[in-house]
Amino acid sequence: MAAGGGGGGGGSSSGRTPTWKERENNKKRERRRRAITAKIYSGLRAQGNYKLPKHCDNNEVLKALCLEAGWIVEDDGTTYRKGFKPPASDISGTPTNFSTNSSIQPSPQSSAFPSPAPSYHGSPVSSSFPSPSRYDGNPSSYLLLPFLHNIASSIPANLPPLRISNSAPVTPPLSSPTSRGSKRKLTSEQLPNGGSLHVLRHPLFAISAPSSPTRRAGHQTPPTIPECDESEEDSIEDSGRWINFQSTAPTSPTFNLVQQTSMAIDMKRSDWGMSGMNGRGAEFEFENGTVKPWEGEMIHEVGVEDLELTLGGTKARC
């Protein structure tokens, strides 16, 4: 009846009254559990020499088993090995310490602590220098890399903030991928005088005298020197073309004085050279191809004149 009442009370507390079948099952389950417990107790009394009371609970059985295994179980439930009695503070917090050491402490060591290390501390190592937009004036952030703190302290405070532009430089160096890409894109349309390749045979013309708009039959844009143009596409194309012409020229101006006959013939064939010769007159021509060593002086004068015209100066001749 007690078991049935207990089952009914449990059902009423949950909001539903157990049925008659459920109450019978609960009674059978409780009788089976008590029968098994009685057999265990009788076996321990008969064969294990355990001093168990007639009506005992499971705590008495656990205490007896601990005593047989060499443990000490006090009246308040404190359990420890013989000869290893812990202090009173540890005894009072023993259940809490066991649960903390087994469940709470290993989880921060395995999950919480290693995760900031690769994400926060690894970022200054992967990038050699901190980003200007993420500059932190707090010296504690540079403890791992002291030289970064020294660099930051050496920068004057009155300087304006660093501005990073995505525009390409006006005249990129020869090692720049922009100049290398512009060299590959050089076509016949980009060359002066309708795509004539004879201009590449005169390195001094390419360096000192870009073609003048007044001395050409076509209307193409001359490969002038880029003058700090802010536009990205024009500056990249002109600077690449200028570097392409400049790379074909030798380092010494006397290289043009050595090649006498071939240079005169090429000047006759190229429109650019012809326009320069017609502008200066026939005073430098000798017997249709016989070139004297001072031919280079004439070429240099033509180059200087065209360079001044390109930059917007007046037409002055030496």
UniProtKB/Swiss-Prot annotation:
Residues 1-13 have a biased composition (Gly residues). Phosphorylated. Phosphorylation increases protein degradation. Residues 16-97 are annotated as: Required for DNA-binding. Changing P222L: In BEH2m; increased stability of the protein and constitutive brassinosteroids response. Residues 102-133 have a biased composition (Low complexity). GO terms for biological process: brassinosteroid mediated signaling pathway; DNA-templated transcription. Residues 91-101 have a biased composition (Polar residues). One of its GO terms (molecular function) is DNA-binding transcription factor activity. Keywords: DNA-binding, Phosphoprotein, Transcription, Transcription regulation. This is BES1/BZR1 homolog protein 2. It comes from Arabidopsis thaliana. The gene is BEH2.
